[in-house]
């Protein structure tokens, strides 16, 4: 992954609009870049395939957004990007990473659980949806600040022997 730039916003926005029912706006991405959030893109052959936005706050961070192009989903790209963002947070000495996800997003919930995130709570009626609203599940991943990086050994949620 590499740092997202203003020149990437159109491609990132296209992915966001294609995969999210209630997507971020161009302004949301520009604001994230302007506020110094950690914004990354994954590209292959000059084509952006995914993105992630992490907001650091003191010794914690919040994963604000992560998206994978529709044609690239279910190939491990989301997991790889999530791991890289956790690695970035770890290198910045963050103690934990928070996120929130729609209660109906079973694929994302499974990815986050298998990557070491645990349920923290529920925000009732947090997201808009076709029937009005739905809950957000808040999750946290505790990052251990040991001498080795998480990916050098075992990631949270993984067994030592795979």
Would you name each region that the model predicts?
Residues 3-75, 79-92, 125, 142-162:
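Acetyl-CoA-dependent GNAT
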């Amino acid at each position: 992954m590499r740092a997202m730039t203003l020149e990437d916003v159109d491609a990132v926005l296209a992915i966001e609009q294609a995969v999210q029912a209630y997507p971020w706006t161009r302004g949301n991405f520009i604001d994230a870049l302007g506020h110094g959030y950690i914004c990354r893109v994954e590209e292959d052959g000059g084509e952006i395939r995914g993105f992630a936005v992490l907001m650091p706050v003191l010794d914690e961070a919040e994963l604000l957004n992560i998206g994978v192009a529709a044609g690239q989903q279910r190939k491990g790209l989301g997991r790889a990007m999530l791991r890289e963002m956790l690695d970035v947070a770890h290198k910045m000495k963050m103690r934990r990473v928070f996120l929130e996800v729609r209660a109906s997003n079973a694929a994302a919930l499974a990815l986050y659980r298998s990557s070491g995130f645990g349920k923290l709570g529920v925000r009732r009626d947090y997201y808009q949806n076709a029937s009005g609203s739905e809950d957000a599940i808040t999750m946290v991943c505790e990052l251990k600040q040991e001498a080795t990086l998480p990916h050098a050994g075992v990631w949270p949620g993984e067994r030592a022997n795979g």
